[in-house]
A protein has these predicted regions:
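Midchain, well-structured core segments that form catalytic/ion-binding scaffolds
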Residues: 1-131
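Predominant activation on well-ordered alpha-helical scaffold segments within soluble catalytic domains
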Residues: 3, 52-54, 76-87, 141, ...
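Glycine/charged-rich beta-loop-alpha catalytic/anionic-binding loops adjacent to active sites
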Residues: 58-64, 183, 219-223
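Alpha-helix N-cap and loop-to-helix initiation/capping positions
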Residues: 71-74, 135, 171, 227-231
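Short secondary-structure junctions
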Residues: 90-99, 147-154, 182-187
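A short beta-alpha structural unit
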Residues: 101-110, 122-128, 154-173, 193-194, ...
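Short amphipathic alpha-helices in soluble, non-transmembrane regions
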Residues: 135-145
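Zn-dependent metallopeptidase/amidohydrolase metal-coordination segment
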Residues: 188-238
């Protein structure tokens, strides 16, 4: 990617922490916790880790009409069974805010009259607790191993990425909470972020804090995503007051 963009070999810009007091970020919640609680501001305590995987089933492509059920190696069916097993097993190890998602399923060749010889799913889960993340991964590995051993299709798991949960700076959280109480008394809460954000990256170099404003209907990553103008204005007020408090020391 760097080569295509013409940046290969160039030194990367680095933040000089000594030059900055820290980093503040405002964002829509992208969920419904604030709205369902009747609150207007969320002070982010931590940002979730996202662990992503590819799960691949290898079966045998064949005719959908002439291949007897007893001898089929239907990769699509094997995938669906694993997806159902994940949805049964994960609640046993999940926390209150753990989430998991099958984001994409691909069947090859993807024709209505052909038994899929290969099936692939992209799967992820999210949490802020490193120990729970490890337990979720073990559960996933066990289910994939069970599916592979049960046959008739082969199943393998590929880890794609594992981000690290990040705590927001305590002083910044306090400043945001005090500002929220000033501008929206009693209408705020501390909460983790279930989505990744810039603050998660910047927090590796400088103190970071983050606030949320409500998402209407808890909708995000969709054309209907929206936030009330009054809540956006309130978020700006809280952000400015918190920044002034932090800079005043």
């Amino acid at each position: 990617a760097l080569e295509r963009a013409g940046y290969a070999g160039r030194p990367r810009a680095q933040i000089e922490p000594a030059r900055y007091e820290g980093f503040l970020e405002a964002h829509i919640e992208q969920g419904d916790y604030l709205e369902s609680s009747g609150l207007r501001v969320g002070i982010v305590t931590s940002i979730v880790a996202i662990w992503q995987y590819r799960i691949v089933f290898e079966g045998a492509q064949n005719h959908a009409g002439t291949t007897r059920m007893a001898v089929r190696k239907d990769a699509g069916l094997a995938l669906v069974r694993l997806a159902a097993a994940l949805d049964q097993r994960f609640p046993e190890v999940a926390g209150e805010r753990t989430v998991w998602t099958t984001g994409r399923i691909t069947l090859d060749p993807g024709a209505p009259s052909i038994i899929p010889g290969r099936a692939e799913m992209l799967f992820q889960f999210r949490d802020v607790d490193p120990d729970r993340l490890a337990r979720l991964e073990r559960a996933l590995e066990e289910l994939v191993a069970e599916a592979d051993a049960a046959g008739p299709c082969r199943c393998r798991l590929e880890a794609l990425s594992r981000s690290v949960p990040k705590l927001m700076d305590g002083r910044f959280q306090d400043a945001l909470e005090q500002a929220a109480e000033r501008h929206a008394p009693g209408a705020h809460m501390r909460m983790p972020s279930a989505a990744g954000h810039d603050a998660q990256i910047l927090a590796q170099r400088v103190p970071a804090g983050m606030l949320f404003v409500p998402s209407i209907g808890g909708i995000s990553h969709h054309w209907s995503e929206n936030t009330a103008d009054a809540d956006i204005a309130l978020g700006c007020q809280v952000m400015a007051t918190a920044a002034a408090t932090i800079l005043d020391g």
